[in-house]
Amino acid sequence: MMVHLTLKSHLIKEELLWHALSPSYSCRYHGR
């Protein structure tokens, strides 16, 4: 359970960094 939460939080951090570094590309990727 702890490992799953750690991986999930890591993925969230990666996604946030990706959005911060390339907002335009992430917008197209998510279709927003």
Swiss-Prot record:
Annotated protein name in UniProt: Uncharacterized protein YPL152W-A
Organism: Saccharomyces cerevisiae (strain ATCC 204508 / S288c) (Baker's yeast)
